[in-house]
A protein has these predicted regions:
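Catalytic-pocket segment enriched in acidic/His residues
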Residues: 2-131
Length: 131
């Protein structure tokens, strides 16, 4: 989930991906011993029932082990830490024409062997502060 107007105004994308409620996780935590091969998991995203992303963790640019190895050269990872890897092809912002999420949309993400997460898109409150 990204706040594109914030993302495009600053030199890094971090702020546009760091808003409260914009990093849904779940429906539960799964430990590595429950996953099997982390490089063979189908990842799919639907918006209002339309398949938008269909990929596999084998398509990651860097495999999970290389990501963890690289991150731990500068940071200590603790149990429960989350490593975000990016997103597969199918991002609405780069579709022609673009397909941005709007209030009322329902986003469903499934990762084989891990579960399904489904969330509605909620409108930003009228009184929220904007830069």
């Amino acid at each position: 989930m990204s706040v594109r107007d914030w993302q495009m105004r600053v030199p890094t994308w971090t702020m546009g991906k760091s808003f409260d409620t914009h990093g849904p996780l779940g429906p539960w935590l799964t430990t590595a011993d429950e996953v099997g091969d982390p490089h063979a998991l189908a990842v799919r995203t639907w918006v209002n029932g339309e398949l938008r992303q269909n990929s596999n963790t084998k398509e990651l640019i860097f495999d999970c082990f290389a990501l963890v190895e690289h991150l731990t050269t500068a940071s200590t990872l603790e149990p429960g830490d989350v490593v975000a890897t990016g997103t597969p092809a199918g991002v609405g912002a780069v579709m022609r024409p673009p397909k941005f999420l709007v209030a009322g949309d329902v986003v469903r993400i499934e990762i084989d062997g891990l579960g399904r997460l489904e969330n509605p898109v909620i409108a930003e409150p009228e009184d929220s502060a904007r830069i």
